[in-house]
């Protein structure tokens, strides 16, 4: 009787784990047609655009502390 109960308990735990894993895997289906339309529109766009990358000087000397009272605060 104890062996049957232990087997039932292990089986129940396995079933619960599998059910939980199936809930994690569920998700909404992706619509790939919208993505392909966007890529076609982007490819058909103006090909004469030039890409200009700018580099900004981010050194320790560029740091300016904020005066008291002008800080945006936490979360802003």
From Swiss-Prot:
Gene that encodes the chain: CEP7
Family that this chain belongs to: Belongs to the C-terminally encoded plant signaling peptide (CEP) family.
Sugar attachment sites: 37, 48
One term under GO cellular component: extracellular region
Modified residues (Hydroxyproline): 65, 68, 72
Biological function: Extracellular signaling peptide that may regulate primary root growth rate and systemic nitrogen (N)-demand signaling. Mediates up-regulation of genes involved in N uptake and assimilation pathways.
GO biological process: cellular response to nitrogen starvation; nitrate import; regulation of leaf morphogenesis; regulation of root development; root development
Proregion span(s): 28-61
Residue segments, region Disordered: 49-76
Organism: Arabidopsis thaliana (Mouse-ear cress)
Signal peptide: 1-27
Coiled coil: none
Induction per the UniProt record: Triggered by nitrogen depletion.
Annotated disulfide bonds: none
Keyword annotations of the record: Apoplast, Developmental protein, Glycoprotein, Hormone, Hydroxylation, Secreted, Signal
Subunit composition and interactions: Interacts with CEP receptors (e.g. CEPR1 and CEPR2).
Record has Glycoprotein as a keyword: yes
Protein name: Precursor of CEP7
PTM text: The mature small signaling peptide is generated by proteolytic processing of the longer precursor.
GO MF term list: hormone activity
């Amino acid at each position: 009787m104890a062996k049957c109960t232990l087997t039932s308990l292990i089986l129940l735990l396995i079933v619960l784990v599998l059910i939980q894993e199936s809930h994690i895997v569920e998700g909404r289906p992706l619509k790939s047609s919208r993505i392909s339309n966007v890529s076609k529109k982007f490819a058909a766009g103006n090909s004469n655009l030039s890409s200009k990358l700018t580099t900004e000087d981010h050194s320790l000397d560029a740091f300016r502390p904020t005066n008291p009272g002008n800080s945006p605060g936490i979360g802003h």
